[in-house]
């Protein structure tokens, strides 16, 4: 897990660093472009101001009459202003589209505007080290170039250089043959020119590549912005829906112990969230289940009553005589009201719809009376016993209850 988190952090840091680097490069290019434009504007404004001033002075000097001395001074000032004007604002036919403009003075007293390549060539021609020192770079490269160089083929060019370039002519007259030989002089010169042309070609290629890169990056940023806007406009929100899980219905059972004098121990179980249509089940023969089922409620209460020993004896007697128990038809929703007499606890019967002390609602929704309950009780059970047997069973029950009351009082 740690390795996964480290990889994630490393990838995130790498992406962040790359994004910051790209943004910084873009900002640098913008600043560089702004500075270039600013310098161009300042240079143009300055040139315009100087030209306007020179033209104003020329006009003023032309209007005013002067003596011969004044004419000389005026001519000198006019020449100076003309040089400045031609330098800062050259005519269209002499304008060179380049990054660097160099003003070079000629032996005739005039000036020429050179670009960076021409300026370096002029500097190379006027430098004595070009002819005296060994060529720069690896010797193998110089030997390779020398194998393709022919001095005889350059005679016309050499003659033109000696005529048109006073610097080369002066250095050639001074050095050949005192310092260097004629062949070495021109070999070193043309090799320097060859290296200068290579550097110029590399510079132009780099410039074009930088311009193409800037153009492609600007197009890439525009495409990314448009794509981001399109995706942001058409993206759909995702809704994670989790269906509700039905909670398990767990019955909660509560056991309540009451003194034997009032009622036997009872266990009450409450079942929540149960459907209203519940069919009670029949339990063991030794337990009586008064069950309350409410149709509109969401709970079922089951009360378990422990029988007395007399009830067990009476139950055994009833089973010997072949008592047949008849279950009444299930009623929708009986309701518990009061406790029935002690005899209802002793008779071990299965009650599904009504308790001894509860009124049973009829089919039309009205509550029944205790008389109806007694009649239903008599109809449900037909005891095949004599009157003497019933009296004997009741006397045993009374005796048992008296003994239990005495035991309870003695225990207290």
UniProtKB/Swiss-Prot annotation:
<feature type="compositionally biased region" description="Acidic residues">
    <location>
        <begin position="373"/>
        <end position="390"/>
    </location>
</feature>
<feature type="region of interest" description="Disordered">
    <location>
        <begin position="208"/>
        <end position="227"/>
    </location>
</feature>
<feature type="compositionally biased region" description="Polar residues">
    <location>
        <begin position="298"/>
        <end position="308"/>
    </location>
</feature>
<protein>
    <recommendedName>
        <fullName>BSD domain-containing protein 1</fullName>
    </recommendedName>
</protein>
<feature type="region of interest" description="Disordered">
    <location>
        <begin position="253"/>
        <end position="272"/>
    </location>
</feature>
<feature type="compositionally biased region" description="Polar residues">
    <location>
        <begin position="353"/>
        <end position="372"/>
    </location>
</feature>
<dbReference type="InterPro" id="IPR005607">
    <property type="entry name" value="BSD_dom"/>
</dbReference>
<dbReference type="Pfam" id="PF03909">
    <property type="entry name" value="BSD"/>
</dbReference>
<feature type="compositionally biased region" description="Basic and acidic residues">
    <location>
        <begin position="328"/>
        <end position="349"/>
    </location>
</feature>
<feature type="region of interest" description="Disordered">
    <location>
        <begin position="298"/>
        <end position="412"/>
    </location>
</feature>
<keyword id="KW-0597">Phosphoprotein</keyword>
<dbReference type="GO" id="GO:0005737">
    <property type="term" value="C:cytoplasm"/>
</dbReference>
<feature type="compositionally biased region" description="Basic and acidic residues">
    <location>
        <begin position="208"/>
        <end position="217"/>
    </location>
</feature>
<dbReference type="InterPro" id="IPR051494">
    <property type="entry name" value="BSD_domain-containing"/>
</dbReference>
<feature type="compositionally biased region" description="Acidic residues">
    <location>
        <begin position="400"/>
        <end position="412"/>
    </location>
</feature>
<feature type="modified residue" description="Phosphoserine">
    <location>
        <position position="308"/>
    </location>
</feature>
<dbReference type="InterPro" id="IPR035925">
    <property type="entry name" value="BSD_dom_sf"/>
</dbReference>
<feature type="domain" description="BSD">
    <location>
        <begin position="145"/>
        <end position="197"/>
    </location>
</feature>
<feature type="compositionally biased region" description="Polar residues">
    <location>
        <begin position="259"/>
        <end position="272"/>
    </location>
</feature>
